[in-house]
């Protein structure tokens, strides 16, 4: 039975009902709807709509219903109820009779669904923060185990300067720290309760909304009823958080896909996160990483879709807002799954140190060290930069590394170059010099790992 049938003389066309109903996806708000209903029943006692005995009956019935939902949430989908609010109310009436019909007094589905969704978002943020931290922990442990794994760092996908695999891992720890910070910021803004705002103008009952917000675990109550029932900023913010987070995971995946390729061959991925080819028996494909990269697009699409849904809506509630859930549910589930999968990829990854070092020694990644050497000898940096460029051209012509050039070859570009240049051009020297905070020197990387462990474990 619909919650709004008295005004209508004809039943809804079945095609419209299927188009209009939202139970198939908003059933996921069942627990939140029941929790909100328990709090609302307490509020109705304070204004004399319910007495204490009636409230206890309702709360007990709702508690039983909550247990049933937790045991088998998908059983809800067997109902032909319009939405989760209708389903909960119908089940409550089945349990307590006409008393259940009193619960919706002073409440609208507009403030009800806004409350349900915020409660769900709060729980989901906690889950996401946990998953972010678990991936950070996996990255830190991988970094700690690979502090001595020297590899090329890249700009423009060209070998640039030597780094370590540990330093690479720690870069993603920083990105994930920003993801967690954004989630925390989102939580602060959504932690206000819209319950008691009615359809748009506020409830006609003198309910203490601050007390009601406290019962539900919100920091406070919202300040304007029109805004409260139409606000979906938290949906946009969470979708934005997810979109940025998925961009980070997509970059992580792309890096490892390249590192795992035959062209780089820096890492081996575990058999547990790879698959084969139906035709080519030699293949070991990085499917987990490719799916992480691929799923980034659907999350970006959810953000774009929700932005377009909201952009032209007048105050206050409009049915368009029913479209706020499917994209949000899918995007946050996708982000959560990808966070877990990224951590699984790191569990069992093998860094191929000899190959990494070999690649770091190629591509003239120590050219900047030669420029710095010249600067230390009194050559202006811009001039030193030009000199080293010429030296690299000569090394390429001879098919040698910079450090393999004879001293006489180097001195044709600058007379200040002496025998002391060769230790400077050594791979380890390139790392050791990066001692400023955030640099790739062994001591800085070790310090960053220690700081991250203290913060995350």
Curated annotation (Swiss-Prot):
Documented EC number(s): 4.3.2.1
Name of the top EC class for this enzyme: lyase
Keyword Cytoplasm carried by entry: yes
GO BP term, example: L-arginine biosynthetic process
Keywords per UniProt: Amino-acid biosynthesis, Arginine biosynthesis, Cytoplasm, Lyase
Pathways involved: Amino-acid biosynthesis; L-arginine biosynthesis; L-arginine from L-ornithine and carbamoyl phosphate: step 3/3
SUPFAM superfamilies, A to Z: L-aspartase-like
Catalytic activity: 2-(N(omega)-L-arginino)succinate = fumarate + L-arginine
Gene3D superfamilies xrefs: Fumarase/aspartase (C-terminal domain), Fumarase/aspartase (Central domain), Fumarase/aspartase (N-terminal domain)
Ranges that cross the membrane: none
InterPro entries documented for this protein: Arg_succ_lyase_C (IPR029419), Argininosuccinate_lyase (IPR009049), Fumarase/histidase_N (IPR024083), Fumarate_lyase_CS (IPR020557), Fumarate_lyase_fam (IPR000362), Fumarate_lyase_N (IPR022761), L-Aspartase-like (IPR008948)
Pfam families per UniProt: ASL_C2 (PF14698), Lyase_1 (PF00206)
Intracellular or extracellular location(s): Cytoplasm
Top-level division of the source organism's lineage: Bacteria
A Gene Ontology cellular-component term: cytosol
Molecular function GO labels: argininosuccinate lyase activity
Record flagged with keyword Lyase: yes
PANTHER family (UniProt xref): ARGININOSUCCINATE LYASE
Homology family: Belongs to the lyase 1 family. Argininosuccinate lyase subfamily.
HAMAP family: Arg_succ_lyase (MF_00006)
Name of the protein in its database record: Argininosuccinate lyase
Lineage: Bacteria, Pseudomonadati, Pseudomonadota, Gammaproteobacteria, Enterobacterales
């Amino acid at each position: 039975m619909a919650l709004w049938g008295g005004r209508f003389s004809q039943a809804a066309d079945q095609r419209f009902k299927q188009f209009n109903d939202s139970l198939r996806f908003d059933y996921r708000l069942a627990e939140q709807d029941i929790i909100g209903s328990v709090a609302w029943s307490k509020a109705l006692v304070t204004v004399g709509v319910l007495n204490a005995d009636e409230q206890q009956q309702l709360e007990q019935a709702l508690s039983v219903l909550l247990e049933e939902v937790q045991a088998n949430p998908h059983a809800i989908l067997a109902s032909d109820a319009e939405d989760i609010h209708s389903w909960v109310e119908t089940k409550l009436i089945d349990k307590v009779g006409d008393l259940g019909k009193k619960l919706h007094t002073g409440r609208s589905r507009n403030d009800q669904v806004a409350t349900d969704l915020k409660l769900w978002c709060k729980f989901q943020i906690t889950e996401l923060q946990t998953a972010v931290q678990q991936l950070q922990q996996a990255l830190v442990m991988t970094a700690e185990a690979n502090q001595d794994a020297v590899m090329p760092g890249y700009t423009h996908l060209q070998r640039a300067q030597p780094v370590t695999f540990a330093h690479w891992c720690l870069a993603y720890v920083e990105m994930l720290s920003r993801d967690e910070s954004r989630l925390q910021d989102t939580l602060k803004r959504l932690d206000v309760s819209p319950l008691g705002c009615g359809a748009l103008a506020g409830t006609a009952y003198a309910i203490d909304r601050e007390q009601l917000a406290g019962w539900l675990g919100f920091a406070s109550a919202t300040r304007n009823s029109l805004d409260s029932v139409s606000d979906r900023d938290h949906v946009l913010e969470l979708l934005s958080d997810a979109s940025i987070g998925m961009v980070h995971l997509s970059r992580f995946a792309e890096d490892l896909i390249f590192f795992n390729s035959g062209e780089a061959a820096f890492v081996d991925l575990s058999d547990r996160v790879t698959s084969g080819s139906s035709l080519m028996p030699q293949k070991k494909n990085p499917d987990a990483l490719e799916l992480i990269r691929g799923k980034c697009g659907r999350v970006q699409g959810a953000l774009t879709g929700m932005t377009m849904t909201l952009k032209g809506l007048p105050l206050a509630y409009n049915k368009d807002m029913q479209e706020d859930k499917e994209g949000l549910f899918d995007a946050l589930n996708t982000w959560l799954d990808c966070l877990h999968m990224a951590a699984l990829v790191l569990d069992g990854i093998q860094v191929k140190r000899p190959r990494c070092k070999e690649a770091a020694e190629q591509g003239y990644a120590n050219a900047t060290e030669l420029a710095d050497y010249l600067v230390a000898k009194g050559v202006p940096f811009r001039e030193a930069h030009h000199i080293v460029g010429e030296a690299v051209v000569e090394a390429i012509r001879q098919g040698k590394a910079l450090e393999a050039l004879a001293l006489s070859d180097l001195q044709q570009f600058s007379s200040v170059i002496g025998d002391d240049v060769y230790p400077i051009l050594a791979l380890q020297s390139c790392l050791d010099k990066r001692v400023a905070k955030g640099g790739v020197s062994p001591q800085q990387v070790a310090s960053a790992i220690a700081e991250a462990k203290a913060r995350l474990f």
